[in-house]
Amino acid sequence: MISTAPADLPSPKPIPAFYCCYLLRSVKKPSSLYIGSTPDPARRLEQHNGFTKGGAKRTERDTLRPWEMITIIEGFTSRTGALQFEWSWQHVHTTRHIGAVETDQLNRRRKDPPVDQGSGIWTSTPKVLGNLHQLLRSTYFGTWPLTVRFLSTEAHSHWQRWTERADGLLPDTIHVELDFHAEGASVLDSNLPANDMTHINATYSGIQDHLEKSASLLNDSAKTLACEVCKKLLSPHGDVIVVCSQPHCHAVSHVKCLSQLFLRDEGSSGLVPTLGDCPACKREVTWVALMKELSMRLHGAKIATKLLKKERKSKAISDSRKSSKSGKKTANTYADILGNDYDDLDEDWMNSVNVDSGSEPLDHKFTNANNSTGRVEIVIEDSEEETFD
């Protein structure tokens, strides 16, 4: 029997679909920078630029708008982790993580006087990116599977120059991605930056097929399942099971068995692996991908049920469109269906997931979510100490 948390403790939550820290830069005044975090960068940028309600007081000034996102750090597996990183990035002069790395070109003390009492620190894009480089090399954050996505060629150039003179290299867990396809001015409004972040998928659509496959495998009572590592029989109602994320692989394993295998192959003494080769298909899978599907299956039954319903509905729509020869656009496209479900998910969206924490056997089945909630307007609020003027 798998033990469960006491009833008075919060229920476990699924890993967020997406959470990132970001660096904003004022288009009108490029020396003005802002550090924040969000589960939805497209909507957050709209808020900062005043198109929707929310944002932060320090980005409301017309003398600084519009803002553009020039760098995002993605891959956080919880809101708490993203907020920890955000705070450390904002307060490099006091965070305990920087001091464990080096005391080279970046000085942890504030040498530049603030512009005024409410404007923060005088700084620059190179310095902020240098602080980021140090954080990613720290003992604490350096073990996280994060991706630094550059949306500005200028920001990436600053990063490269810093990398060349830094004392150390980024750990293998940190990846750098270039995303320059939307630089320049918007075709709709020349006063706005082209990169509105709408091309970034911040929804769970990426794990729908994985969830569908897991549901099919684990809910088939006629199918005998065995761990790919230890070869022992698996019980969908008693074992914590991970399912390979590769599309055509049906490998299942004990989470502990696969974790130990990946750690051994990595030669790591850590507790949580980063990635590894599936023992069945021999293709590389990331541990985060496996845990995101597992956490949704175990702790996000309502959302998982909605995802599977929309996956099946979208496939039906796709089949209908293929069979139609009219060439007309079908109403409620896949993007429309998915967008309607995720538009109101925010920093606090996980609080709406109601998962029983009783002492019942573990069940990998998804129950129907009968209780629907009305749409409400959600305003993102964040700290007031992350603007650098």
Swiss-Prot record:
InterPro entries: GIY-YIG_endonuc (IPR000305), GIY-YIG_endonuc_sf (IPR035901), Slx1 (IPR027520), SLX1_C (IPR048749), SLX1_endonuclease (IPR050381), Znf_RING/FYVE/PHD (IPR013083)
Biological processes annotated in GO: double-strand break repair via homologous recombination
Zinc finger residue extent: SLX1-type: 227-281
Disordered: region residues: 38-59
Keywords: DNA damage, DNA recombination, DNA repair, Endonuclease, Hydrolase, Metal-binding, Nuclease, Nucleus, Zinc, Zinc-finger
GO molecular function, one term: crossover junction DNA endonuclease activity
Cofactor(s) this protein cannot do without: a divalent metal cation
EC number in record: 3.1.-.-
The protein's role, per its UniProt record: Catalytic subunit of the slx1-slx4 structure-specific endonuclease that resolves DNA secondary structures generated during DNA repair and recombination. Has endonuclease activity towards branched DNA substrates, introducing single-strand cuts in duplex DNA close to junctions with ss-DNA.
Identification of the protein by name: Structure-specific endonuclease subunit slx1
Protein species of origin: Talaromyces marneffei (strain ATCC 18224 / CBS 334.59 / QM 7333) (Penicillium marneffei)
